[in-house]
Regions:
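Catalytic cores and adjacent binding grooves of peptidoglycan-active enzymes
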Residues: 1-48
Length: 48
């Protein structure tokens, strides 16, 4: 079982939010600037 979040936010905030998420231990990170979308999870390390 893995903790995961899907978040919508302005793309201008993605970079700072992702840096903070990494510090908190999230390893699966996906983002789509065109959709203002960020996915975070505690699964294996990967980025898309």
């Amino acid at each position: 079982l893995t903790l995961a979040f899907d978040v919508r936010m302005p793309k201008e905030r993605h970079e700072a939010f992702i840096k903070l998420a990494r510090k908190c231990g999230f390893r699966g990170i996906g983002h789509r600037d065109y959709e203002n979308f960020v996915h975070l999870d505690m699964g294996p390390e990967r980025e898309w």
